[in-house]
């Protein structure tokens, strides 16, 4: 499961994965600008200021980008392996976007998925459970703030992606 992955992943085995940076985030946010803003005919959108604000927010969070992140850890990429036991029964596919990044990234993919409507209370309990059962060095409030900043970035990107699909 996601907690086992975070607690047992050895970074030495992940040396071929790149660390997530603001440049990666900017590429993702560009989907919002390109497809959502410009397709909605908003020519007055302050693109440079938008990226500057996101850059400021990103660096103010002081992320500890030292954990494995699948990045597309959604239910459609998980499957049941009946011949295994415990956490090994959860098979995971679709690794092409994996990187070294924020501890809670895959939790964001699961809980903040706009196609699945968990209650905020349910999500909050699962976030706290994840935090309490992983080796996160940040205090809980810092982790939570980082979680929500990256969740917002993900939702912003998805607005662009969905707008593109409607074009």
Regions found by a protein language model. Name each.
Residues 43-53:
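Central P-loop NTPase core of STAND/AAA+ ATPases
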Residues 9, 70-71, 159:
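Conserved short hydrophobic patches within well-ordered secondary structure
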Residues 30-40, 100-137, 152-167:
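Active-site activation/catalytic loop segments of kinase-like enzymes and analogous catalytic loops
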Residues 1-4, 31, 52, 56, ...:
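Alpha-helical elements of Rossmann-like donor-binding domains used by nucleotide-donor carbohydrate transfer enzymes
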Residues 11, 15, 19-26, 75, ...:
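Glycan-recognition and catalytic cores of secretory/periplasmic carbohydrate-active enzymes
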Residues 5, 55-107, 117:
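Active-site acidic catalytic loop and adjacent metal/ATP-binding pocket
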Residues 17-23, 139-151:
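All-alpha amphipathic helical-bundle segments outside canonical DNA-binding/catalytic cores
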Residues 1-44, 64-66, 90, 99:
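A cross-family kinase active-site recognition segment
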């Amino acid at each position: 499961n996601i907690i086992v992955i975070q607690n047992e992943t050895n970074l030495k085995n992940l040396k071929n994965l790149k660390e997530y940076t603001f440049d990666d985030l900017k590429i993702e946010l560009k989907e919002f600008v390109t497809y959502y803003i410009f397709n909605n005919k908003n020519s007055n959108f302050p693109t440079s200021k938008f990226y500057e604000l996101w850059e400021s927010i990103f660096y103010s969070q002081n992320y500890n980008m030292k954990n494995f992140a699948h990045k597309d850890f959604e239910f459609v990429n998980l499957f049941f392996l009946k011949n295994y036991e415990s956490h090994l029964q959860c098979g995971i596919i679709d690794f092409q976007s994996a990187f070294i990044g924020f501890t809670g990234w895959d939790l964001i993919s699961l809980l903040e998925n706009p196609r699945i409507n968990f209650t905020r209370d349910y999500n909050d309990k699962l976030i706290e459970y994840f935090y309490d059962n992983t080796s996160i060095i940040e205090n809980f409030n810092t982790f939570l703030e980082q979680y929500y900043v990256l969740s917002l970035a993900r939702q912003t990107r998805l607005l662009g992606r969905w707008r593109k699909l409607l074009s």
